[in-house]
Every structure is written in structure tokens, then in C-alpha cells.
Amino acid sequence: MYSVAVMPALLASGWLQSQGLDPRWGQLGLFLLAAVLLLGWENLSNDVFDDDTGVDTVGKPHSLVALTGRRDRIAWIANGLLAGGLLLMALVALRSQPVVLLLVLICCALGYLYQGPPFRLGYRGLGEPLCWLAFGPFATAAALMALQPPTSLPAAVPWQVALSLGSGPALATTLVLFCSHFHQVEEDAAHGKRSPVVKLGTAKAAAVVPWLVAASLALQWLPVLERQWPSTALLSVIGLPAAAQLIRLLREHHHQPQRISGSKFLALRFQALSGLGLAIGLGIAPWLGR
């Protein structure tokens, strides 16, 4: 699950290498650790917030609050992870540029808007766009600025690069969230959580999945076709078999919650493999003379 946390930094590292720049590996290690801690906060706090509304009673067996029955303790742990992650990000920003911390704080704010009271925008079906923004342009821009060599620090936030580099992989991350709703449609609807799958119904939502996969890969391959990226970036194709399995599973069994409870893990495999393939493909390009 934590591949979604580390992907922006891995992509930034690969892109910098494709540009003939040497990423700051110490910064990369700190950024990765901080990102994992912050996603831990997001996941645990979401368990807490969903427990408050009762939506996790049946459909979310992996909820630590549901498993342990210790809501307050999980909330304390979540807040500790948030504090630790932000402290590490502050150190990363101190060693690069202060705006890195601001970008990460925006990502955290988007994460809170998703499930946190009084907003709970995920209950209005807005979780997916929030996810794309956080793991796409904002996290990717933060990683690019944090990992740049001191002699090559950009004067402004590199939004154009962050969008071209982060949009496709972030859409794959958004697909993971989208697929997590399929097996708990009835429970979500009963508790007022109007996820996109609840709004569309499982059949129509399953028909959307191939388009999300295609859009994610298209956004990753378009810069190659425009000769902005090396052809080795097409290595993201290694995620395609997992995507094909996901599409087939949801097409045939979208109405059977028990059969599709693992669909988000297939989406996660697609996200991890396609993103890692893109990062590696970019990173090895100079070695292959591309």
C-alpha cells in the first residue's frame, strides 16, 4: 500500500537522472521515510474518522480501529506519525527550499479534507480528485525541489514538470482509491458515503476502470511520443498485466463483493509496477545513451 507514498520521490529521482542531474540521495531517503509516515497518518486517521460514522463495521476488515477496538489509541498513533513525518519534511525543506514543506502541508490538508470532519469530502464523492492533486502535482513538485542538487535548485515551483511527470502515476494512485469502494457499496450508501462507485453503480463504475488505466498510461507515454522523454520511459508497460487482471475481474464480478474485495490490490500492483517502470526507465536512459 505504501508504494503510493514513495512513488512521487522515485519518479522525481528518475527524471532528474534522465536530465543528467545526480539526485541528493540523502534527501531521497529522508523524503521516502517522511512520506511513509505521512501516509500512515492518513490511513490510520481515516480508520478513526470512518469508525466515527460507522461505515467500517463490515466492509473494511483491515481497519485497525475495527480490529483492535482502540479508537483513541489509534488516533494518538496517527497524530504521532503526522508529527514525525512533518518534522522529517521540515528537515528536508531546511536542506533544500522552504516551499517543499508548504507543498507537503498542502498534500496533508487535501488528505484531511478527504475524510476529516467537518469536511468529509470523500463522502460527497470528491476523494478521487483530492487524491490526484495530492499525489500528482503537489507531491511531485515537492519531491523535485527536495532532490535537486544545490547548484540546480529551481527559482520557482516546477509545475510544468510536476504535471507531466506526476499526472499519469497519480491517476493510477487514484484508481486504487476508486477500486477500494467496489466491495463496500451497500455499506457506504447506508452511511451516506456517496463514493463514485455508489453514484455510478458497480456495473458502470467497472466500465470506467479501463478508461482510467488507458488515461494513466497515455499520460505517461505522451511525453515519449513528443520526444520530451526517452523511449525507455515506456517501461511503465510492465504494469499492464495487473491492469488487465483488474479490468477482467471487475467486468465479470463487479456485483459480487466477496469476489472483488481484492480489486484494490490489483489496482495497487498496476500503480506500483507502472510507476516503478517509469522511474527506472527514466533513470537508466543516460546509461543507455537515450
What name fits each language-model region?
Residues 1-30, 119-127, 131-134, 149:
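Topogenic membrane-insertion module of multi-pass membrane proteins
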Residues 3-12, 63, 129-144, 198-202, ...:
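Small-residue-rich segments of transmembrane alpha-helices in multi-pass membrane proteins
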Residues 10, 20-45, 101-112, 155-179:
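Membrane-embedded alpha-helical segments that form the functional core of polytopic membrane enzymes
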Residues 37-59, 174-197:
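Acidic (Asp/Glu-rich) catalytic motifs at the cytosolic membrane interface
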Residues 58-96, 193-229, 265-274:
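Multi-pass membrane catalytic core of lipid/isoprenoid biosynthesis enzymes
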Residues 63-153:
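Intramembrane alpha-helical segments
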Residues 131-185, 191, 203-207:
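Functional transmembrane core segments of multi-pass inner-membrane proteins
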Residues 225-287:
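Extended hydrophobic alpha-helices typical of membrane-associated regions
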